[in-house]
Amino acid sequence: MKGAIIGDIAGSIYEFDETEESLDFPLFVKNSRFTDDTVTTVAVAAALMEGKASCCGYIEPLRRQLRYWCRKYPDAGFGGLFRCWFLADEAPAYGSYGNGAAMRVSPAGWIADTLEEAQALAELTAVVSHDHPQAIKGAIAVASAIFLARQGKEKEAIAAYLRSHFYDLSRTLAQIRPSYGFTCTTDDSVPEAIECFMEGTDYEDTIRKAIWLNGDTDTQAAIAGSIAEAYYGVPDALWQQALPYVGDEEMKGVIRQFYENYIGSRGNSFDFNRDKQEI
């Protein structure tokens, strides 16, 4: 979750502003900010914690928490159709195939006890607004990668699973970047974000690669960063740099509670002895 938030903040200033060929660019500057990626991720975390604790289902908390948090931060950079959705007290999902479901799904990968649960929760977090098959697939793919990384699976095993069930993942970043540009469609942004994780050497390198790709910089850094967190962990020094850009105490409280309940409590030190078994 922190991995998604840091990626979002770091990528926020580079959207539509091509980075240099080098990966050596500042991650945090005066104009950096959290965007809709962070707001909706926090909303999903709050909803899943509520649903897990109450055993009364997740759909109603997801709708309510997304509307609450998005209305609280209405200028965070939401798309027009999603804005109409969260401003309406009652509105159905609207068939979006955008990457909004994948960018907010990371809590599902952490809160789940099994891969099947992670995938089921990911679908629920998507369908309340983004019910197109592309959007659902993207959310499930990202949550699956997070869960498998949490379990200590090697990148090769994670990639093999994702190729088998979701995306081709045959193009390298060097092949993607020359002709790549901004897109927020799931099928044209989520596989590329996953590839940033696959080629990243640590958490920071992963989000730098996602920004360097020159696509949907904040969202792709959030997606790649969410997977990289589960694999590498997030350096505390980097989180401390990002923290001043995070919202108010209520937002920070949800993040803190989620880590206390579902990440720190599971003893994830990120010093994994990774197995190399097939998934």
Range-by-range predicted roles:
Residues M1-I279:
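Structured, active/binding-site neighborhoods that engage oxygen-rich ligands
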